Amino acid sequence: DVLGSRGLGDVYKRQIFQPEKVRKNIEFIEQIKKLEPDVICVVAYGKILPSEILEIPKLGCINVHASLLPKYRGAAPIQWAVLNGDKTTGVTTMYMDVGMDTGDMILKQEVEIGENETTGELWDRLSIIGADLLVKTLKQIEKGTAPRIKQSDDFTMAPMLNKEISK
């Protein structure tokens, strides 16, 4: 089952992988295949998984993304929300596909951004919300009740910040 025979407590005993390279990484792909996972969860990883990995788990690969998709697809959604003076942001769980944060959404939770809140403070809050949303998402996937909500074509990107942007 998705959450393990002992429920949520068993989730924390799962292996965590953070390979620097996933594309054409045959050893890593074989390692994942041997695990025969029901679900692969991706959080704050920053790399697009190739179809060879996305096709492995029986119930799909899911991602926890720190924005209300389709707004702020990409590597720096929290930073862009703060830089743009947004009043709200949130967390979205979604099924992964080969695109950058383009998969079907599962759950969302919106939060207000404090007037003087820093990206670090917001990151901390969204991390807690994201963990809770991940658990809710996994429970729905296990029950077979997780929705698949298509994303609108009206999206914005949140590219990694660089020196040019800061000028």
Across the structure, where does each feature detected by a protein language model lie?
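One-carbon transfer enzymes
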Residues: 5-167
